[in-house]
Amino acid sequence: MLGKKILGLPVAFALSLAGLVLLPAVRQNPRVSGVFLGAAAALCAWSALFSMQARSRRLALEVNLRKQHYVQACAQGSVLLYWGWHWPTVYESAHFILAQLLFAYAFDMLLCWSRRDSYILGFGPFPVIFSINLFLWFKPDWFYLQFLMIAVGFAAKEFLRWNKEGRRVHIFNPSSFPLAVFSLGLIATGASNITWGREIATTQFYPPHMYLMLFLIGLPGQYLFGVTLMTMSAVLTTYVFGLVYLATTGIYFFYDSYIPIAVFLGMHLLFTDPSTSPRTELGRILFGVLYGLSTVALYQLLGSAGMPTFYDKLLQVPLLNLSVKGLDWLARSRLLRAVSPEVIGRALAPHQRHLAFMSIWAIVFAGMNATQGVGDDHPGQWLPFWRHACREGRPYACPYLADLQVGYCRRGSGWACNEAGLLHVALSQSGEDLRRLDIAGAEEHFNQSCDRGIAAGCHNAVTLKNREGEFAAARPTIEDYPIILRGSKGEIRERGPSELYALACKQAWTEACADDPQKR
């Protein structure tokens, strides 16, 4: 398509963006409506200004549906659909995702035509927008930052380029770069609460068999683009570290998993962009190892600094993108050439090699799934593991257990309130948790437990007030189990007494095994 008429395309996208304010979900929030209209107006103004400046130019529009774009978009879209089925906020935010797509197309067109005469129209913005929305959303009152994040991503793709194997290509993935930049800004300003980042990282584990789902949706891209080695090396590096950490400390490094689901997602659909990753097979292995190790390091660094840890899979990707030339050079060096996978099976065609690596990855994943390395039943998500670890004096176990108990107390468990108070008292005496040095902080938990009908909570509130007597523990009631059995998977479906006792027994609540009427 040639001529000035194609300048109407970005305007059409901008007007479609403005038209979203007619939706009730947008109209009821004046700030969101203002952001949508403001973004649309800015795009229209840019288009008008550009139209006046480009009168003597012959602009072109080329349609090219690249396999890399639509395969990635299908995988990411599948995750959004499956995740949204179990966390309705995703579906409720569909108009926000649509707004970002409309903005991305208009912005990308105008930016490209500002620098050259041809624009390639395809599915390119889809994987960028879907990828960003799998990891970070700004809340409605701050949604203008979402548009700014998209603009930064496409600008980085257009302006930050280098020569790679004789071609002028972009350095950074257009979704991972703005994610890292804005993550740094949020950390620096302490403004993580204006995003859904924490909720995203938590709720992505809600759907059943999410690890298996991510494994399966990653297979087409691994076959077509040969990215298996990156994913497999990243997963294995993190998993092996977790095994060593467990053997050394007796607890799990990531607390409720060997590899958090959001990190596992990043290992499949974030850092594996074939355009911004190494070309050599050994380089891709090293790339994955570095991603796994850097995720571990960032999780520890952020956690120790009291910062949100959900940035652990985002911050390092641009630095890894900068390393790809060096990793490929290292992989081709005389030092490592002999151990490169390229020396094995040289007669195999590329897709045959991809299938071979995918087969190895499938065996590795099946083994991890069978040994609870991944899956829905990791013991670290349940209270009994942490109660046992706390009693054994494992590092960080008691403070983490206290946090879990406070969370269940807030959800309505009187037993958990009493346990949170008891552990608060113990931690105030041991000094292990700097947040719980004042014993008086246990009073609120005991009072909440008492208000919910736990006699031990009433007794402990009096004991704490008088500073004399012994504190008393209680047993979970049938009303507590729907709350304290939820783990990291969200609300449980079981509600009948027999089902609850059976589930509790499965999770190693020994008292539940004795209380189950069917086992008496």
What are these regions (language model features)?
Residues 2-113:
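N-terminal signal-anchor module of multipass membrane proteins
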Residues 29-39, 204-209, 253-261, 284-286, ...:
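Loop-to-transmembrane alpha-helix initiation sites
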Residues 46-61, 104-117, 152-168, 215-225, ...:
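C-terminal ends of transmembrane helices
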Residues 111-203:
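Membrane-interface helix-loop-helix junctions at boundaries between adjacent transmembrane segments
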Residues 147, 367-434, 440-444, 448, ...:
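Membrane-interface segments at or immediately adjacent to transmembrane helices
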Residues 178, 186-239, 243:
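Internal active-site segments that recognize and position negatively charged phosphoryl groups
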Residues 347-373:
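Internal/C-terminal transmembrane anchor helices
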Residues 392-395, 405-406, 411-414, 420, ...:
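Short helix-capping/linker turns of helical repeat alpha-solenoids
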